[in-house]
């Protein structure tokens, strides 16, 4: 089984010793080759870098280094938004209003046969994606 990782999960993992123990255990149990990112996650991290820059240059620099590490670690496993993902997102977002990035992540997961790993499982409920929230106990579920 392979997984598409949301920003909230990789950000939690980044906390190291302060990471939620359920998230930490789950992440450590998955082979690197089974973990994928969306280009949207890289964009969200970049946004964090830029938002921090004017008020906390040290934090911005640390986030910039982390972004580079993530891009390097996930080279070849970063998925973009193509016509198939856009089509799936259009179908999902017609069901009900959903946050755009969460919907595009769910569409990317469905299109690529991946399980979406996110803390925002309720945001994509009822859209047909297989979702795992490692903050919660229980099995993966199609929502």
What are the language-model segments listed below?
Residues 31, 74, 127-128:
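Short, structured coil segments at secondary-structure junctions
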Residues 1-41, 51-65, 69, 138-143:
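Short, well-structured N-terminal submotif of metal-dependent ribonuclease cores
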Residues 1, 106, 111-143:
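Acidic, PIN/NYN-like endoribonuclease modules and their adjacent C-terminal/linker elements
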Residues 6, 44, 102, 120-123:
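Acidic active-site catalytic centers that drive phospho-/nucleotidyl reactions
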Residues 10, 42-45, 86, 124:
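A generic structural signal for short hydrophobic patches within well-formed alpha-helices
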Residues 47-50, 61, 72-119, 143:
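Active-site neighborhoods of divalent-metal-dependent phosphate/nucleic-acid chemistry enzymes
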Residues 36, 79, 132:
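General small-molecule cofactor/ligand-binding pocket signal
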């Amino acid at each position: 089984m392979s997984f598409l990782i949301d920003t909230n999960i990789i950000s939690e993992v980044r906390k190291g010793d302060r990471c939620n123990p359920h998230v930490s255990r789950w992440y450590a149990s998955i082979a690197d080759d089974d973990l994928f990112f969306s280009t949207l996650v890289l964009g969200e991290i970049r946004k964090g870098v830029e938002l921090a820059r004017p008020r906390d240059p040290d934090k911005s620099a640390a986030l910039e280094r982390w972004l580079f590490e993530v891009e390097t670690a996930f080279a070849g496993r970063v998925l973009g938004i193509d016509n198939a993902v856009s089509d799936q997102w259009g179908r999902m977002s017609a069901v009900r209003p959903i946050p755009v990035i969460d919907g595009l992540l769910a569409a990317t997961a469905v299109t690529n046969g991946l399980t979406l790993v996110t803390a925002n499982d309720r945001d994509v409920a009822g859209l047909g994606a297989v979702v795992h929230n490692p903050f919660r106990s229980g099995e993966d579920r199609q929502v």
